[in-house]
């Protein structure tokens, strides 16, 4: 059910295209072309919004109890119609100025109406399709307005008096701008910025900047003359055509607060370290940041390690663990199940790591991963062979091969599988005397004579005779790679160290450290080299720190320094600076 409803109209005026006319042929700037305003009848389309009322059905509740019933509702709908109306508008057209006419497709109005039908010297000039006046004998000119100079024709006649006729005195000689009279004739000239037409009398406006006039950037017209100009940041060179860059930084053209960097056609302001450039790109403002460490509170929600990051805390786990789905909780990573374990035969997983084992008839190899077959005869002999323990050395008796054996060392014999022998056995062992001791040659030392003074770490110096390392107070071990202060805070001397990558009673357990660094003989904790830190020595020192555990602060002048060595804190200076802290500027060359 619908019913019409009179509503309102939103009208938008849209002008139709102008019909083609003389304005498309004659343009402003053409010779003798004038602008005219005229009224033109145009048709316009006017959109209007119409409204009507529509009645729709819908289901509603509450008719009688919980039942539904049909209801009716009136809604207003709209549609758009277009109506055509006619109106008068002012339009600009270009026509020939009064007294002038355009012929065919001439670029302007070059013919004067005043000359049509004009009588000169009793002769009528007829303007036909040839657009040339047919002059009678004895007359000349575009409108036959000049009489031929009989005096010039008879100049060779003896005694004849010559008299010049000024053709420019009559209608300016037919010239549009300037008429130049000469002896016996004349010619037309044009003002600056114009050129003569093919008829030698009409002047056409020229563009002096046509072809850019050789200007590198811009060509501008002033009083009919071309003049070169440059973009901002450039200036004209001596030839008045090329453009060269203006160094704003050399003078006072660049109002930079701190530093100025020149560029082609412009410049850029920069600030001292610790400042930032303002919105005006000229002034500098000190940077004041409030550093909030999100990891200080509740370790950032991380189970193990927390590092501040953009957007919040970044959690990481100890070796042998992995992040749970919440990105914060660390759970055990089963290397045996994942296949990342290096075990050749048996793998035993434990919290945070794993160990390799071998089947019966095999023994673990020196790399802690593989399994070597036991020789049956050696296996029987090992049941009867005791273990001879030297200080820092464990080997079967006799200890073969050794680089050099020297009698004099007191040692004890004990069973390898029973570190806690009973007192009676100890009494018997105490009475035994070893017949050999290990002596390394050629400046080597260590359990298997594989170390030298080049392996001394953490500031350790070579002992006299190159028989070991002299360690600073806070370090110990064969090569000064173990801290003398344990995690409990008590000053204790740690046992002698193992080779890089191993720890444990027999130096057979693998360290889980990055970069193949030493680890604690007993605990397996990573002992970082200079310039590295972190639980696994996997992190390089942050900028501005160096030394053991990155605990020392670089003393370099930051704004003059390219790099501070993470190992020893030495400064690498930027170009133009010198000194142990890059604190001195190099003198300018004379």
Curated annotation (Swiss-Prot):
Molecular function terms from GO: calcium ion binding
Annotated segments matching region Disordered: 393-424
Cystine pairs: 109-125, 135-144, 168-179, 175-188, 190-203, 209-219, 215-228, 230-243, 249-260, 256-269, 271-284, 449-462, 456-469, 471-480
Keyword Ribosomal protein included in the entry's annotation: no
Location of the EGF-like domain: 105-145, 164-204, 205-244, 245-285, 445-481
One Pfam family linked to the record: EMI
SUPFAM superfamilies registered for this protein in UniProt: EGF/Laminin, Growth factor receptor domain
Compositionally biased intervals (Acidic residues): 413-424
SMART domains: EGF, EGF_CA
Keyword entries, A-Z: Calcium, Disulfide bond, EGF-like domain, Repeat, Signal
Signal peptide positions (record): 1-23
Domain EMI per the UniProt entry, residue ranges: 44-104
Gene3D superfamilies registered for this protein in UniProt: Laminin, Tie2 ligand-binding domain superfamily
UniProt keyword annotation of Repeat present: yes
Protein name: EGF-like and EMI domain-containing protein 1
């Amino acid at each position: 059910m619908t019913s019409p409803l009179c509503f309102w109209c939103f009208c938008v005026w849209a002008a139709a295209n102008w019909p083609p006319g003389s304005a498309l042929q004659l343009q402003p700037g053409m010779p003798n072309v004038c602008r005219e305003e005229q009224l033109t009848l145009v048709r316009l389309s006017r959109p209007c919004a119409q409204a009507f009322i529509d009645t729709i059905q819908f289901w509603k509740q509450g008719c009688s109890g919980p039942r539904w019933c049909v209801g009716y509702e009136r809604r207003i709908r709209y549609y758009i119609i277009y109506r055509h109306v006619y109106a008068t508008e002012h339009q600009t057209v270009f026509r020939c100025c009064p007294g002038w006419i355009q012929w065919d497709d001439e670029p302007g109005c070059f013919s004067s109406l005043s000359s049509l039908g004009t009588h000169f010297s009793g002769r009528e000039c007829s303007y036909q399709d040839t657009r040339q006046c047919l002059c009678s004998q004895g007359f000349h000119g575009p409108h036959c307005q000049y009489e031929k100079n009989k005096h010039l024709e008879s100049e060779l006649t003896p005694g004849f008096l010559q008299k010049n006729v000024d053709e420019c005195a009559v209608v300016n000689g037919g010239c549009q701008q300037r008429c130049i009279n000469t002896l016996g004739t004349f010619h037309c000239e044009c003002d600056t910025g114009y050129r003569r037409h093919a008829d030698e009398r009409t002047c056409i406006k020229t563009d002096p900047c046509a072809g850019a006039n050789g200007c590198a950037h811009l060509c501008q017209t002033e009083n009919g003359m071309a003049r070169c100009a440059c973009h901002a940041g450039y200036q004209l060179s001596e030839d008045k055509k090329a453009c060269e860059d203006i160094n704003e930084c050399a003078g006072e053209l660049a109002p930079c607060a701190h530093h100025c960097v020149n560029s082609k056609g412009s410049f850029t302001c920069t600030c001292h370290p610790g400042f930032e450039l303002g919105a005006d790109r000229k002034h500098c403002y000190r940077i004041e940041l409030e550093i909030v460490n999100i990891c200080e509170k509740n370790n950032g929600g991380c189970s193990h390690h927390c590092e501040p990051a953009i957007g919040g805390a970044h959690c990481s786990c100890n070796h042998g663990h992995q992040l749970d789905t919440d990105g914060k909780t660390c759970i055990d990573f089963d290397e045996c199940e994942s296949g990342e374990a290096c075990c050749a035969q048996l793998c035993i997983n434990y919290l945070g790591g794993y160990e390799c084992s071998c089947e019966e008839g095999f023994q673990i190899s020196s790399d802690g991963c593989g399994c070597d077959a036991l020789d049956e005869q050696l296996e029987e002999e090992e049941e009867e062979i005791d273990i001879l323990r030297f200080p820092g050395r464990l080997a079967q008796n006799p200890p073969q091969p050794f680089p050099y054996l020297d009698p004099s060392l007191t040692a004890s014999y004990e069973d390898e599988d029973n570190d806690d022998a009973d007192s009676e056995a100890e009494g018997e062992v105490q009475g035994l005397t070893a017949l050999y001791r290990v002596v390394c040659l050629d400046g080597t030392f260590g359990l298997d004579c594989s170390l030298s003074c080049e392996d001394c770490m953490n500031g350790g110096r070579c002992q006299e005779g190159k028989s070991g390392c002299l360690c600073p107070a806070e370090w110990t071990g064969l090569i000064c790679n173990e801290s003398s202060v344990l995690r409990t805070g008590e000053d204790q001397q740690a046992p002698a160290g193992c080779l890089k990558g191993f720890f444990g009673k027999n130096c057979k357990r693998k360290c889980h450290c990055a970069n193949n660094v030493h680890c604690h003989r007993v605990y397996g904790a990573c002992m970082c080299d200079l310039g590295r830190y972190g639980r696994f020595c996997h992190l390089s020192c942050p900028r501005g720190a160096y030394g053991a555990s990155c605990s020392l602060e670089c003393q370099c002048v930051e704004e003059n320094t390219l790099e501070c060595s993470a190992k020893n804190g030495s400064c690498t200076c930027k170009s133009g600076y010198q000194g142990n802290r890059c604190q001195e500027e190099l003198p300018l060359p004379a």
